[in-house]
Amino acid sequence: MSDYKIWVDADACPNPIKEILFRAAERKALPLVLVANQMIRVPPSPYISQVRVGVGFDVADQYIVDHVEPTHLVITADIPLAALIIEKGALALNPRGELYTVDNIKQKLTMRDFMEDLRGSGVHTGGPDSFSQADKQAFANSLDKWLVRV
């Protein structure tokens, strides 16, 4: 099991997702690393750690990319980061339980870029729906599917 690890792009990760991850790390004795540019509260555990990176654009993302390995799972809502993780052969899961894959990442990037272009031209596109109990459950289910394999 020592080859497996979970990385968290922690600055924007919802607290309920972190709690699920903390419990999973303890239950499976699995390394969990939260990467952020601010201090993140983590429970005392030999399996849970945090890395505080400097402030700057995509500094936490780059740290994760530099350290991820193919047997790792990365939790992120950042689609460009997910694309880089997939390129390195690892898995990326968003906090709403959606697994980013080789098959869907290009479409996700295209849609993200399109929405960014719309916002840049002054069109109000709205944001994602509020994080819900259904999202939390979908994440827990997806994480459990990965944990069964480790």
From Swiss-Prot:
Matching entries from Pfam families are given as: DUF188
Cite the InterPro entries for this sequence: UPF0178
Q: Which HAMAP family match?
A: UPF0178
State the family it belongs to. Belongs to the UPF0178 family.
Name of the protein: UPF0178 protein Shew185_1764
Q: Which organism is it from?
A: Shewanella baltica (strain OS185)
